[in-house]
């Protein structure tokens, strides 16, 4: 990170099943001649102190990206909180001294280039425990800043309480919300369907 803010890792959550696109890995679908995941990495890598990829199944399918691939540590595909937990636990075990992880969806090709800076600055300004992104009046809880020290509490919530929704988790803490403009391109546009892919293709010429 090119700032005096705390060291921060990024985890790209690529564990979605992609049912609305006929199955497979959504981040591997192409827009602008490149995989969505290429766009995500290009935008995140300059901002953070390391990138992780959260995905289940055979990690070899992501080998060309040369990133650590970490699977959900909780069985049953419990959603993005499991991917966040995977990143927090991996960071604690492998990157001593790094206290923060930012999560991002693997199907968001237009992520803001100031994502980490603004999340960290808002957390500090508000004295918050966590921070999440928003645009156009909509909160995007999958795009968030998470404290590594909360990993045991998150594991307990997932395993013992069967908690699945991110907003139920964040409600337990002081939360900062950071808004970005949603025009001309919503930076948190996500490609969930084939129609979304076509729209993303059109938007690539307008994104910064």
From Swiss-Prot:
Query: Can you tell me which residues bind GTP?
Result: 13-15, 26, 54, 72, 107
What compartments host this protein?
Cytoplasm
A single GO cellular-component term on record: cytoplasm
Q: How does it assemble?
A: Monomer.
Record's keyword annotation contains Metal-binding: yes
Q: What GO MF annotations does this protein's record show?
A: GTP binding; metal ion binding; molybdenum cofactor guanylyltransferase activity
Query: Catalyzes what?
Result: Mo-molybdopterin + GTP + H(+) = Mo-molybdopterin guanine dinucleotide + diphosphate
Gene Ontology biological-process entries: bis(molybdopterin guanine dinucleotide)molybdenum biosynthetic process
| EC number, as in UniProt | 2.7.7.77
Q: What class of enzyme is it?
A: transferase
- Its primary localisation, in coarse terms, equals cytoplasm
Q: Which cofactor does it need?
A: Mg(2+)
Domain note: The N-terminal domain determines nucleotide recognition and specific binding, while the C-terminal domain determines the specific binding to the target protein.
Which CDD domains did the record assign? MobA
Q: Which UniProt keywords apply?
A: Cytoplasm, GTP-binding, Magnesium, Metal-binding, Molybdenum cofactor biosynthesis, Nucleotide-binding, Transferase
Q: Which HAMAP family match?
A: MobA (MF_00316)
* Source organism phylogeny: Bacteria, Pseudomonadati, Pseudomonadota, Alphaproteobacteria, Hyphomicrobiales
What is the name of this protein? Answer: Molybdenum cofactor guanylyltransferase
Gene3D superfamilies according to UniProt = Spore Coat Polysaccharide Biosynthesis Protein SpsA, Chain A
Database matches in InterPro entries: MobA-like_NTP_Trfase, Molybde_CF_guanTrfase, Nucleotide-diphossugar_trans
Give the source species: Chelativorans sp. (strain BNC1)
Function, please? Transfers a GMP moiety from GTP to Mo-molybdopterin (Mo-MPT) cofactor (Moco or molybdenum cofactor) to form Mo-molybdopterin guanine dinucleotide (Mo-MGD) cofactor.
Q: Which gene encodes it?
A: mobA
Q: Which residues bind Mg(2+)?
A: 107
- Which superkingdom is the protein from? Bacteria
Pfam families in alphabetical order: NTP_transf_3 (PF12804)
SUPFAM superfamilies in UniProt: Nucleotide-diphospho-sugar transferases
Family membership noted in the UniProt record = Belongs to the MobA family.
């Amino acid at each position: 990170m090119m700032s005096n803010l705390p060291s921060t890792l990024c985890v790209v959550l690529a564990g979605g099943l992609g049912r609305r696109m006929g199955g497979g890995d959504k981040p591997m679908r192409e827009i602008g001649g490149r995989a969505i995941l290429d766009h995500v990495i290009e935008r995140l890598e300059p901002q953070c102190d390391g990138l992780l990829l959260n995905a289940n199944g055979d990690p070899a399918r992501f080998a060309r990206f040369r990133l650590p691939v970490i699977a959900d540590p909780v069985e049953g595909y419990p959603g993005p909180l499991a991917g966040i937990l995977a990143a927090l636990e991996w960071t604690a075990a492998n990157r001593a001294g790094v206290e923060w992880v930012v999560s991002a969806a693997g199907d968001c090709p237009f992520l803001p280039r100031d994502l980490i800076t603004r999340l960290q600055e808002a957390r500090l300004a508000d004295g918050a425990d966590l921070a999440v992104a928003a645009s156009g009046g909509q909160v995007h809880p999958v795009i968030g800043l998470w404290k590594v020290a909360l990993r045991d509490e998150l594991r307990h919530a997932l395993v013992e309480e069967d908690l699945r929704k991110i907003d139920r988790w964040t409600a337990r803490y002081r939360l900062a919300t950071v808004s970005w403009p949603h025009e001309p391109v919503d930076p948190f546009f996500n490609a969930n369907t084939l129609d979304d892919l076509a729209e993303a293709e059109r938007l690539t010429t307008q994104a910064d």
